[in-house]
Curated annotation (Swiss-Prot):
GO terms, biological process: chemical synaptic transmission; exocytosis; Golgi to plasma membrane transport; membrane fission; mitotic cytokinesis; paraxial mesoderm formation; protein transmembrane transport; regulation of macroautophagy
Protein name: Exocyst complex component 4
Modification type N6-acetyllysine: residues: 9
Keyword Flavoprotein: no
Keyword Manganese: no
Effect the entry attributes to changing residue 220 to F: In a colorectal cancer sample; somatic mutation
Residues modified to N-acetylalanine: 2
Chain coiled-coil ranges: 32-114
């Protein structure tokens, strides 16, 4: 048990320490330090027991694992043998290596010599290959340049020059080749820059021309010959910017997706098929040539000149296109071709700008990437491009708008120049008939000579264009020469009206491209604004003033009438004043300018107001010159000016009927009685207003030409008022369109202020009022003439005559009145429309009748011969008026019957009233009875006369009562 315990102790110790040497040292220390022999013996015994225990355990384990132990021992033996063999072999190899080393050491110098010779031979072979390749560079370079594979050519040339100036510098045989390739390298960038400019300015714009041709072919199939090539009102607004998609094929990437480093050149494809990629290749080639600064400088220097060449090419293209359509710009004023030119230039300049944005993107890549190994390269930007485009457009507009006034001094205005013949008026106001295409009987264009000649000329033009990038015209180029410059239309200020809206849209595109805010304007807008405000408006005003003054500042502006051609074109039946037509033409011209230059509508409307006001003043002065004599108005003008009289006359049915034709007037029962009552009211007012005063000759218009002038003024001012009202109503209507309707009208007019509209309406109304006053003056003047001649007839005439030859003659005053009325009728029939002519003479018979009947009180005496003479006077007046009015003029029968009533005695007159009833007023009967008392003998004393007068009044009252009773009975019956 003790042995087992000892063995367990030692096992545990061994297991804890896992170091037998440590256990042995511990036992030795215990034995050596112990003073007691017994303890040492005990320790020794425990140790021996432990060893024995270990031997037994080991024997048991060996017995238990004998097979495994045997196998392990055998395996160990085989491994040991193999290791021993390997050591022997390694030793042998080391000995062999040492032997080889010794042998190689002996051949070292010989091997080194051979190795160096091998390297030298290899280098020589490489140099020979390189020389052979360099000798082929000129030929390959020429092929690449011919096929326009410039990137490959650049790489080849740069590497060849580097080789010739590097490793092959000492090769004397390559000196000529070195000079040749060096010269090519020095000039290659010029070729690349030229190609870049060709794509920037010719290739990019050729697509625009091609698209326009395709559009023209399509439109020519569907459009009518009368439709203009370009309609300003249907232009797209705003035009879309030309993006980079125009410079790439369908399968290529856009510019923003291509980096300059990623651009590769495909030798199998046409390099110019994709313009965007081709320009990238050119920029990459220039970067490899380290010529980016020179490229930028060349682009900046050539920009303006290239843009001018685009203008020149486009001018010839537009003229050529117009020539092919059969238009001759040297004969016709064709501002439409200028519009076509500008539209083409806008598209081309947009294309150029888009191409420049592509190039700038590539140039910025060259600055950012270390491709060029250059620093501080200053590039241009898109603002520089747009500034040059604006400069070129300004120069073009300066020429076409004739801002230097090179032609205005020698040529009359194309817009406001009219000869006194009036043919130009007719041309202006004529309705433009749609032009029918003329069917030619035959053509020479398909003859062999024409075909060969056309083909030859077409080939010549194509060759010249491809060589210089500039379209060449024929012998005359179908262009207008002007100081070394060719134009598609005659330069003039009015060209701005056709191009204003497209130009304004292009300016908006420029400002959008430059990112300008509302507060900042581009130079082209400033140029346009300054031109219109400082030059165009003043020029228009000067032209208008010149034309209006030409017809209003004459000695007698109311005598100058438009000719028959103008009247026919205007559709008027009576002549108009030439000055009125000029003013109306001016107003229409200004309104057209307001639509063409909508941004300046207020200025043009103000001009309209000023010109109309000036013309109103002119007409007022001319009117006063006719109706005013020695600071005093003639009676007719004074009555027309009187508000009460004019209001009364305008309230009468004959004035209201004048506004509509007779066949359109509503039918009225007892219309004749109604109109007769109106005539009676008018006569009563006029007779009452004049009284028994005689009218001196200076208070009437004796000159028929003055009356004719008033008639012409009436017709002219009424026509002007109608035209201006129509124009102004269209203007106000156009401002009130709904948004849906406004989308179809491209006027873009700003709203017209209420003040201006009110002023325009008041001016139109004032012209109508003045026209009405002229007509009233004519209406009244004829009646004043009747007063002038017929009142002296009763007051100063001698009608107490005996029967003789003198009694058979008409009164001289009646003859003069008839003569005046006939002269006025002749003048009015030629100057006034029929219904106005009728207005002047209708009711005149009634007035004459009233004057003659009222004049009975002024006769001192009247005899039967005088009564007969008076009846003859009435008859001749009635006959004359009947010829004028084409009606019976029964009112004069009424006057004749009144004087025939004087054949009776005073008592017979009273009986006549009882028998026939009351036909005249009480006062008229009293005048007749009183005249009989003065004229006849044996009429009794004054008391008897008064008795008759009293009896007359009683009879009239009785007749009035009977008439009223009869009327009441009729009403009751109904």
């Amino acid at each position: 048990m003790a042995a087992e315990a000892a063995g367990g102790k030692y096992r545990s110790t061994v297991s804890k320490s896992k170091d037998p040497s440590g256990l042995l040292i511990s036992v030795i220390r215990t034995l050596s330090t112990s003073d007691d022999v017994e303890d040492r013996e005990n320790e020794k015994g425990r140790l021996e027991e432990a060893y024995e225990k270990c031997d037994r355990d080991l024997d048991e384990l060996i017995v238990q694992h004998y097979t495994e132990l045997t196998t392990a021992i055998r395996t160990y033996q085989s491994i040991t043998e193999r290791i021993t063999n390997s050591r022997n072999k390694i030793k042998q190899v080391k000995e062999n290596l040492l032997s080889c080393k010794m042998l190689l050491h002996c051949k070292r110098d010989e091997l080194r010599k051979l190795w160096i010779e091998g390297i030298e031979h290899k280098h020589v072979l490489n140099l020979l290959d390189e020389i052979e390749n360099i000798k082929q560079v000129p030929q390959k370079l020429e092929q690449c340049m011919a096929s326009k594979h410039y990137l490959s050519a650049t790489d080849m040339l740069v590497s060849a020059v580097e080789s010739l100036e590097g490793p092959l510098l000492q090769v004397e045989g390559l000196s000529d080749l070195r000079l040749e390739l060096h010269s090519k390298k020095m000039n290659l960038h010029l070729v690349l820059i030229d190609e870049l400019h060709r794509h920037l300015y010719i290739k990019s714009t050729s697509r625009v021309v091609q698209r326009n041709k395709e559009k023209g072919k399509i439109s020519s199939l569907v459009k009518d010959a009368s439709v203009p090539l370009i309609d300003v009102t249907n232009l797209p607004t705003p035009r879309k910017f030309l993006d980079t998609s125009h410079y790439s094929t369908a399968g290529s990437s856009s510019v923003r997706e291509i980096n300059l480093q990623d651009i590769k050149e495909d030798l199998e494809l046409d390099p110019e098929e994709n313009s965007t990629l081709f320009m990238g290749i050119l920029i990459k080639g220039l970067a490899k040539l380290k010529k980016i600064p020179e490229t930028v400088k060349a682009i900046i220097e050539r920009l303006e000149q290239e843009l001018k060449q685009i203008v020149k090419r486009s001018t010839t293209q537009v003229a050529d296109s117009g020539y092919q359509r059969g238009e001759n710009v040297t004969v016709e004023n064709q501002p439409r071709l200028l519009l076509e030119l500008l539209e083409l230039l806008f598209d081309k300049f947009n294309a150029v700008a888009a191409a420049h944005s592509v190039v700038l993107g590539y140039l910025q890549d060259t600055v950012v990437t270390p491709l060029t190994q250059q620093e501080d390269i200053k590039l241009y930007d898109m603002a520089d491009v747009w500034v040059k485009i604006q400069d070129v457009l300004q120069m073009l507009l300066t020429e076409y708008l004739d801002m230097k006034n090179t032609r205005t001094a020698s040529e009359p205005s194309a817009q406001l120049s009219y000869a006194s013949t009036g043919r130009e008026f007719a041309a202006f106001f004529a309705k433009k008939k749609p032009q029918r295409p003329k069917n030619s009987l035959f053509k020479f264009e398909s003859s062999s000579h024409a075909i060969s000649m056309s083909a030859y000329l077409r080939e010549q033009r194509r060759e010249l264009y491809s060589r210089s990038g500039e379209l060449q015209g024929g012998p005359d180029d179908n262009l207008i020469e002007g100081g070394g410059t060719k134009f598609v239309c005659k330069p003039g200020a009015r060209n701005i009206t056709v191009i204003f809206h497209p130009l304004l849209r292009f300016i908006q595109e420029i400002e959008h491209a430059l990112g300008l805010g509302p507060a900042k304007q581009c130079p082209l807008r400033e140029f346009l604004t300054v031109y219109i405000k400082n030059i165009f408006l003043n020029q228009v005003l000067a032209e208008i003033n010149k034309e209006i003054e030409g017809v209003t500042k004459t000695s007698d502006p109311l005598k100058i009438l438009a000719n028959a051609d103008t009247m026919k074109v205007l559709g008027v039946q009576r002549p108009l004043l030439q000055s009125t037509i000029i003013v109306e033409k001016t107003v229409q011209d200004l309104l057209n300018l307001m639509h063409d230059l909508s941004a300046y509508s207020d200025q043009f409307l103000n001009m309209v107001c000023v010109k109309l006001q000036e013309y109103k003043d002119t007409c007022t002065a001319a009117y006063r010159g006719i109706v005013q004599s020695e600071e005093k108005l003639v009676i007719s003008a004074s009555w027309a000016k009187d508000d009460d009289i004019s209001r009364l006359l305008k309230s009468l049915p004959n004035w209201m009927n004048m506004a509509q034709p007779k066949q359109l007037r509503p039918k009225r029962e007892e219309e004749e009685d109604f109109i007769r009552a109106a005539f009676g009211k008018e006569s009563e007012v006029l007779i009452g207003n004049l009284g028994d005063k005689l009218i001196p000759p200076q208070d009437i218009l004796r000159d028929v030409s003055d009356l004719k002038a008033l008639a012409n003024m009436h017709e002219s001012l009424e026509w002007l008022a109608s035209r201006t009202k129509s124009a102004f109503s269209n203007l106000s209507t156009s401002q009130m369109l709904s948004p849906a309707q406004d989308s179809h009208t491209n006027t873009d007019l700003p709203p017209v202020s209420e003040q201006i509209m009110q002023t325009l309406s008041e001016l139109a109304k004032s012209f109508q009022d003045m026209a009405d006053r002229c007509l009233l003056v004519l209406h009244l003047e004829v009646r004043v003439h009747c007063f002038h001649y017929l009142i002296p007839l009763a007051k100063e005439g001698n009608y107490a005559i005996v029967a003789n030859v003198e009694s058979m003659d008409y009164d001289p005053l009646v003859v003069k009145l008839n003569k005046d009325i006939s002269a006025i009728e002749e003048a009015m029939s030629a100057s006034l429309q029929q219904h106005k002519f009728q207005y002047i003479f209708e009711g005149l018979g009634h007035l004459i009748s009233c004057i003659l009947i009222n004049g009975a009180q002024y006769f001192r005496r009247i005899s039967e011969s005088g009564i007969k003479k008076m009846c003859r006077n009435i008859f001749v007046l009635q006959q004359n008026l009947t010829n004028i009015t084409m009606s019976r003029e029964a009112d004069l029968d009424f006057a004749r019957q009144y004087y025939e009533m004087l054949y009776n005695t005073a008592d017979e007159l009273l009986n006549l009233v009882v028998d026939q009833g009351v036909k005249y007023t009480e006062l008229e009967y009293i005048h007749a009875l009183t005249l009989l008392h003065r004229s006849q003998t044996g009429v009794g004393e004054l008391t008897t006369q008064n008795t008759r007068l009293q009896r007359l009044k009683e009879i009239i009252c009785e007749q009035a009562a009977i008439k009223q009773a009869t009327k009441d009975k009729k009403i009751t019956t109904v």
